[in-house]
Amino acid sequence: MTRHTPSRTRETIEQLLSAIESRDLRAVERYLHPDVVWQNVPHPPTLGRQAVTELLANVLCWSDQVRWDILSSAASGETGWYERVDRFWMAGEEHAVHCNGVFEVDAGTQMVRSVRDYVDLGEWRSRIEPVMTQLASRPASEVVARHLDAVRRCDPVAMAADYGLHAVLQRPGRAYAGWAAIADYFDTVPTRLGDAEVLFEHIEPLGEDQARVAWRIAAPGGASHSGIDTFSVLAGRITHQLTELHSEDF
């Protein structure tokens, strides 16, 4: 049986922590074992890669920045102990929580198979839940505005951040189903845009749970593309986007 050296154990754990800081759920999943168990002790554990990703996505996707500062660490065999301050910036404010985590690594897959985090979850929830409630109750126009700002910055992870895990982005001839597929699509946008600029019209609210925005891509040399995006939003996350083109796709 292959066993991890302490340095390899640290490397695997810290790759997961870096993925969490990136807010890219695809990277997070890359370092989670399919049968991973994540427990915020003494609360019941979350079982399996998909469920753990959903647990983390609740706060990662609404964070503009994430930083998990390591205060101290130790490793032995396939186990690592990490004292941290987990820091999240949401809605313009920083929210931090002290954690002591015990991480276990699967040597065969080089993935994290178990996390036991010791944290005052009650105190953390008392501070974070009002923020999460406010973000979940935003009208569609506010959610879409945050997404459009990410498009202007050409930040693919931020572009995907406001989509639900099971959202669908529907463009002419193709639909992208699920957060990872949508993020993969947004990864291609900066290269495809090149030096072109996306110009958005005013966001048109269609009730509390839908919004529509017309856009135009102005490319050097006079070429242009245009269309309309209609967004459906539930609990602060985009669940469906329909893109209608007025010309060829960019």
Positions of PLM-derived features:
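Short, low-complexity N-terminal intrinsically disordered segments enriched in polar/charged residues
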Residues: M1-P34, E123-A161, L165, F250
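A general structural-boundary detector
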Residues: R3, Q15, Q39-P42, M90, ...
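A solvent-exposed, acidic/Ser-Thr-rich amphipathic alpha-helical stretch
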Residues: S7, S18, L25-E78, P156-D209
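A beta-strand edge to alpha-helix "cap/lid" segment located at domain peripheries
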Residues: L60-P139, V143, Q170, A183-F250
